[in-house]
């Protein structure tokens, strides 16, 4: 039971009950036939995707979804990488020395 502000009023008593969604019935041929015909009608009326409240045009710079499927293997390199560095494991490059950080002693002096 959930108590609400209305419970403080004398002489009234309300009980809040959570509702459940109806469950699908499987195995019955008649209900399966009815549910498919009803669901096909619902699918025609429903809006499929996007933002139905504020429809905005697609920007010119945005690629279509088909562009990603039509790319050849040589064009599928990362856009933001330099071609010489793309896919390299770093074996042929000069090794960088690791420079450990010097400990900061400013906090120790204050204590």
UniProtKB/Swiss-Prot annotation:
Sequence motif Initiation motif, residues: 85-97
Biased composition (Basic and acidic residues): 72-81
Effect upon mutating residue 78 to A: Stabilizes the protein in G1 by preventing association with the APC/C complex and degradation by the proteasome
GO MF annotation list: chromatin binding; molecular adaptor activity
Motif D-box per UniProt: ranges: 23-34
Keywords: Acetylation, Cytoplasm, DNA damage, DNA repair, Isopeptide bond, Nucleus, Phosphoprotein, Ubl conjugation
PTM section of the record: Monoubiquitinated at Lys-15 and Lys-24 during normal S phase, promoting its association with PCNA. Also diubiquitinated at these 2 sites. Following DNA damage, monoubiquitin chains at Lys-15 and Lys-24 are probably extended, leading to disrupt the interaction with PCNA. Polyubiquitinated by the APC/C complex at the mitotic exit, leading to its degradation by the proteasome.
Induction: By UV irradiation. By ATF3 in response to UV-stress.
Self-association state and partner proteins as the record states: Interacts (when monoubiquitinated at Lys-15 and Lys-24) with PCNA. Interacts with isoform 2/p33ING1b of ING1. Interacts with BRCA1.
Domain remark text: The PIP-box mediates the interaction with PCNA. The KEN box is required for the association with the APC/C complex.
Protein's job: PCNA-binding protein that acts as a regulator of DNA repair during DNA replication. Following DNA damage, the interaction with PCNA is disrupted, facilitating the interaction between monoubiquitinated PCNA and the translesion DNA synthesis DNA polymerase eta (POLH) at stalled replisomes, facilitating the bypass of replication-fork-blocking lesions. Also acts as a regulator of centrosome number.
Protein name: PCNA-associated factor
Species lineage: Eukaryota, Metazoa, Chordata, Craniata, Vertebrata
């Amino acid at each position: 039971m959930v108590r609400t502000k209305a419970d403080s009023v004398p002489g009234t008593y309300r009980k809040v009950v959570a509702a459940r969604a109806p469950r699908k019935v499987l195995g019955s041929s008649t209900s399966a036939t009815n549910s498919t015909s009803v669901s096909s009608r619902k699918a025609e009326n429903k809006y499929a995707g996007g933002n139905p409240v504020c429809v905005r045009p697609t920007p010119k710079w945005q690629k279509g979804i088909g562009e990603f499927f039509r790319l050849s293997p040589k064009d599928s390199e990362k856009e933001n990488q330099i071609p010489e560095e793309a896919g390299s494991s770093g074996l042929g490059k000069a090794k960088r020395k690791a420079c450990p950080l010097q400990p900061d002693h400013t906090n120790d002096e204050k204590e």
